[in-house]
UniProtKB/Swiss-Prot annotation:
Keyword Cytoplasm: yes
Native source organism of the sequence: Xenopus laevis
Annotated gene: rab3gap1
Family: Belongs to the Rab3-GAP catalytic subunit family.
Main subcellular localisation: cytoplasm
Taxonomic lineage from the root: Eukaryota, Metazoa, Chordata, Craniata, Vertebrata
Protein name (record): Rab3 GTPase-activating protein catalytic subunit
Subunit text: The Rab3 GTPase-activating complex is a heterodimer composed of rab3gap1 and rab3gap2. The Rab3 GTPase-activating complex interacts with DMXL2. Interacts with LMAN1.
Length: 978
């Protein structure tokens, strides 16, 4: 009992009976949303400026509510307006009406070209819409009335003065009913939607009767009704107008007629007219009842006399554009899985392996009876001899590319094949072109996109592969051309011919990987040629090399020995300078090989025995620097260039170094691996400066690590005394260790830091195993680069400001996407889609310029006006015509519609209105066809429902088209005593 009497043990259950039903909960939730959005109470905003509904910023926010298990979406639409402090301080007063009622009478934004349908029908700047969920609809009349009652209660409880609409029936009908409440006033928003139009409502007089009967004004003398009328005419048939785009001759291209194909030039333009319709709106913005006649017998509404004309164009949906299709088709190759061998059959490389091996063996040339010096070969035979290997196993008819097209492409890619002098043909000239264009902004675009310079071999190859894919056999044609390209690369490597269209020097890491690989191959060729030429022309050749030459001469006749001297030097270097390169030698060259190795060993032993060898490998004296120990001048040595690297090699090297870990042993090994170039430079320095010390090397190699101080000697003279920096004095310093290990060996006798033979074979193997899909991914940045340059070129010819802005956005977007090694396919598709959109915009500009005959305009002022008009048509949803039907653009448009009206057959007229429309047209004397749409806005202010009620705005909007008829009304009434 004591526990039961304890007040803390008592539990009270509180039941809220105020929201007992689902309907009341729904109303409560709507009120909560309105309160959360701060739509409670009065609002005071300045009247909207003219055209603000179109140029202003519209925003919306939404929330979801439930009515039992039925989901509704509440969305608040409003025009963003800046209110001044003066307007915020103003008191609205008791007699003020809600802002939405004031908007009903505002004429500044009638017929906005782009707006929510409720904005166009009622002229509102702010409203809330309650609509059913995604696939639901409120169809029954009882549910519609229930929702409307909920809206009315929520507005009354919250004091919200923003109009609230409910969407009913199927969503495609866009049927809304709603209400707006203010202090003592209310506006009901109603709507009628019909498919068949009664004849009496097809003209102004019939609509005035509806409006007046709906208002039910008790006054005997009705105030005048203000009227705004707009007729819209649609021009769809453009066949009689010139379409400037000339499509390519596809039959000629497919048939292999090279004359119809210009390599390096991308196609551009739309294959169909990108402008599908032109809409002319003739507007009478401010008319008064009684000053105009428009009934079923006669009409004063002549479009030529309309004070306002405006035009909009309807764009074709996804017009077929050649540049976009070109790039898209190339991008689709990324998804192919086949290899080149699967597409073309077994490669001829394996079956001709022995032949290729014989060519690659440099020493075998010594035993040939009549060797031909390489530098005397004609480059003209490159393409033909390389392709013979493939064509032995594949007939000409089976090749995806015919001979004419293939020859044209290869001559375009390798212009030096036309030269009879193969040693110094045109690679140097192509390099000059590259350097001369380096200042251009468009030229430097490749560094942003990681593609290749626009006049490089890689860039040209991308365009040719893209063209072959589009016009000549698709993926098989691409595989065929790539196979020929790889053969050409191997031929050039084996015969010491530089690759044209590539800049000198190390691979440019700002370019795509394929371009870097080709540059690497060219680097190998340059090193190989420079080494061979240097050995051939150097009279002070080392004893080991001289003995090799002598041995080789003994094996041949005197005449043959002279011819093969250059060959021997090249061959000796190809196998003796690298410990990792071995070549199979014939039996008659084993003696030569042993002799060469023995000579090399003797040279090394002599170096060890002689502690003070003669200086070797000097480049030039280094200013006034002297050796610290001997006082001799310090000479800069001839050093080996560091090994060029590509992106994949750098990544591979980074992975290897990272796997060494963070231990002391790993760090030491990592430092040893990275100091190969340092050790080579130290050996070259020791050979050029006998008797030098580490301090001498640091003074030349890293001056910041040698610190000099000004001190006084015993005699009081100022002298400079130097020492190594602190980091050079660290125990077990890698520099000290490398210096102690280094031997005085000049660069020409050192082991090569960069084995050009090995690296070239790596590149050639890398090229040979590329599938068409891999090749496409490598070259897609180049194709996008070319497409952007084409867009810039075409836009400059048309001068489209919006086009320039769009191109800059594409470049910015592309540079972010293509910087990654493996870009996402979806992002690449977005870039290609943006390119197609800009191409379509430029094609639309050309179409409009052709239709308005701007090129044939003789007056400069009139021409400028038309160009400005066309530019506005591309950027703005609707453009007013200066001078209406009497202006330059208006006259041209009038002629278009007159021609259209003359070609229309009577059966195309609307059956139910043909007689009245024809009669009224003949009466008014207009030569325009019947309008495709008629819009009317009727406004007035009357007391309602009693004569002594407050004068409130009334509005009705009507739109009549061939498909349907819609009436929307906003009728206000005084609720103070009713």
């Amino acid at each position: 009992m004591a526990a039961d009497s304890d007040p803390e043990s008592e539990v009270f259950e509180i039941t809220d009976f105020t929201t007992a039903s689902e309907w009341e909960r729904f109303i409560s939730k709507v009120e909560e949303v309105l309160t959360e959005w701060k739509l409670i109470g009065e609002t005071s905003n300045k009247p909207p400026e003219k055209g603000e509904y179109t140029s202003g910023v519209w925003e919306e926010k939404g929330e979801e509510v439930l009515f039992a298990d039925f989901r509704f979406s509440i969305r608040h639409h409003y025009l963003v307006q800046k209110s001044s402090e003066k307007e915020e301080k103003e008191d609205t007063g008791e007699d003020s009406i809600p802002v939405c009622m004031q908007d009903l009478l505002c004429t500044n934004n009638d017929f906005p070209p782009v707006a929510h349908c409720l904005v166009r029908w009622y002229g509102l700047r702010e409203f809330v819409v309650i609509s059913p969920g995604a696939n639901d609809a409120v169809i029954s009349e009882s549910k519609c009335n229930l929702l409307l009652s909920s809206v009315s209660i929520a507005l009354g409880n919250t004091g919200c003065q923003v109009p609230l609409f409910v969407q009913v029936h199927q969503k495609w009908r866009k049927l809304y009913v709603g209400e707006c409440r203010g202090p003592g006033v209310r506006t009901d928003f109603e709507m009628v939607h019909l498919r068949k139009v009664p004849n009496q409502y097809t003209h102004l007089s019939g609509l005035l009767d509806i409006f007046k009967s709906k208002i039910g004004c008790p006054l005997t003398a009705l105030p005048p009704v203000n009227i705004a009328i707009r007729f819209t005419y649609v021009l769809q048939d453009w066949q009689q107008y010139f379409w400037p785009q000339q499509p390519p001759d596809i039959d000629a291209l497919i048939g292999g007629e090279v004359g119809g194909l210009e390599f390096g030039k991308l196609p551009f333009g739309a294959c169909e007219d990108p402008i599908s319709e032109l809409h002319l709106a003739t507007t009478w913005p401010c008319l008064t009842e009684g000053i105009i006649v428009d009934n079923d017998v006669y009409s004063d509404l002549d479009p030529l006399q309309a004070p306002q004309w405006s035009v909009r164009v309807r764009k074709a949906d996804n017009p077929q554009c050649m540049l976009g299709d070109f790039v898209s088709e190339f991008f689709r190759l990324c998804r192919r899985k086949e290899s080149t061998d699967e597409l073309l059959g077994k490669s001829a490389f394996e079956e001709n392996g022995k032949e290729g091996a014989d060519i690659s063996q440099a020493l075998s040339k010594l035993t040939e009876p009549a060797p031909v010096p390489i530098h005397k070969l004609s480059v003209t035979s490159m393409v033909h001899s390389a392709r013979k290997k493939i064509r032995k196993h594949r007939g000409a008819d089976e090749s995806p590319l015919n001979n004419d097209v293939l020859n044209a492409i290869l001559f375009f890619l390798f212009p030096d094949t036309k030269s009879l002098d193969g040693s110094e043909a045109k690679p140097s000239t192509s390099t000059g072109n590259i350097s001369s264009q380096s200042e251009s902004e468009d030229y430097n675009l490749y560094s942003q996109l990681k593609s290749a310079p626009s006049n490089s071999l890689t860039y040209k190859l991308a365009l040719c592969l893209c063209m072959v894919n589009f016009y000549h056999g698709g993926v098989k044609g691409v595989a065929h051309l790539w196979q020929e390209f790889v053969l050409e690369m191997r031929y050039r490597w084996e015969n010491n011919f530089l690759i044209p269209g590539l800049a000198n020097g190390s691979p440019d890491l700002k370019c795509c990987l394929l371009h870097q690989k080709l540059q690497m191959l060219n680097c190998c060729l340059e090193r190989k040629k420079a080494r061979d030429e240097g050995k051939k022309g150097n009279p002070l050749y080392s004893s080991s090399e001289s003995s090799v030459n002598k041995t080789a001469s003994d094996l041949l006749s005197p005449v043959e020995a002279d011819k093969s001297k250059y060959e021997v030097a090249k061959s000796w270097d190809s196998w003796s300078d690298s410990e990792e390169e071995f070549f199979e030698c014939h039996s008659d060259t084993e003696e030569l090989k042993e002799s060469g190795q023995e000579s090399a060993r003797k040279a090394k032993e002599e170096t060890k025995e002689n502690p003070s060898p003669k200086p070797e490998g000097r480049l030039h004296q280094s200013g006034n620097l002297m050796l610290l120990n001997s006082g001799e001048p310090l000479y800069i040595p001839v050093t080996q260039d560091p090994a060029p690297m590509t992106d994949d090699l750098l990544e591979e090297q980074s992975e290897v170094l990272a796997k060494l870990g963070t231990s002391a042993e790993g760090a030491h090994l990592r430092a040893r691996m990275q100091s190969a170039c340092l050790l080579s430079d130290m050996e070259s320095f020791k050979a050029a400066n006998p008797g030098c010390c580490l301090e001498d090397f640091v003074r030349w190699y890293s001056p910041r690590d040698y610190i000099e101080e000004e001190v006084m000697d015993d005699k009081g003279n100022k002298i400079f005394k130097g020492e190594l920096s602190a980091r050079m004095k660290i125990p077990n310093n890698m520099w000290v260790e490398a210096w102690e290990t280094a031997k005085p060996i000049p660069a020409r006798r050192q082991r090569r830091l960069f084995d050009d033979t090995k690296e070239a074979e790596k590149v050639l193997h890398y090229l040979a195993v590329q599938k068409p899909a891999d090749l496409t991914r490598h070259l897609l940045p180049c194709v996008i680069h070319a497409a952007l340059l084409k867009l810039k070129e075409e836009e400059a010819a048309e001068d489209i400001p919006s086009g320039r802005k769009a191109i800059k956005q594409i470049i910015s977007h592309s540079s972010k996407v293509l910087r990654f090694p493996s870009p996402d396919d979806k992002k690449l598709e977005d870039v290609i889609s943006q390119i197609s959109n800009v191409e379509a915009a430029i094609a639309r500009a050309r179409s409009l310029k052709a239709k308005f005959a701007i090129d044939r305009c003789e007056k400069s002022e009139e021409r400028e006006d038309l160009e400005k008009f066309v530019s506005c048509l591309l950027d703005q949803p609707e453009v007013p015509i200066i001078g209406a039907g009497r202006g330059a653009a208006g006259t041209i448009i009038h002629k278009m519609f007159v021609q259209r009206a003359l070609t229309l057959a009577p059966v195309e007229e609307e059956p139910k209105r043909s007689s009245s429309s024809d009669d009224r047209r003949q009466t008014s004397g207009t030569d325009f066809p019947s309008p495709a749409g008629r819009e009317l806005i009727l406004r007035t202010s009357v007391p309602r429902p009693a004569p002594y009620s407050k004068v409130l705005p009334q509005r009705m909007y009507s739109v009549l088209t061939k498909e349907d008829f819609r009436l929307t009304g906003a009728f206000s009434s005084d609720t103070s005593f009713f």
